[in-house]
Amino acid sequence: MALTCTDIPKFICAVLLPPIGVFLEKGCDYHLAICILLTILGYIPGIIYACYVILAY
């Protein structure tokens, strides 16, 4: 999917605090719960998953 202007702030949020970027993209969904869990288990997996969600949707 093509990147839009709104994806840039989402990526910035995804790097600083990954669940925020996912919340801005998908809202309160199971993706948010997965991202929170991955961020707690390891910061880098949370960032990777957040970037995946932003790029995929």
Swiss-Prot record:
Membrane topology: Multi-pass membrane protein
Membrane spanning stretches: 4-24, 36-56
Keyword Transmembrane carried by entry: yes
InterPro entries hit by this protein: PMP3
One Pfam family matching this protein: Pmp3
Family in the record: Belongs to the UPF0057 (PMP3) family.
Protein name: UPF0057 membrane protein T23F2.3
Lineage: Eukaryota, Metazoa, Ecdysozoa, Nematoda, Chromadorea
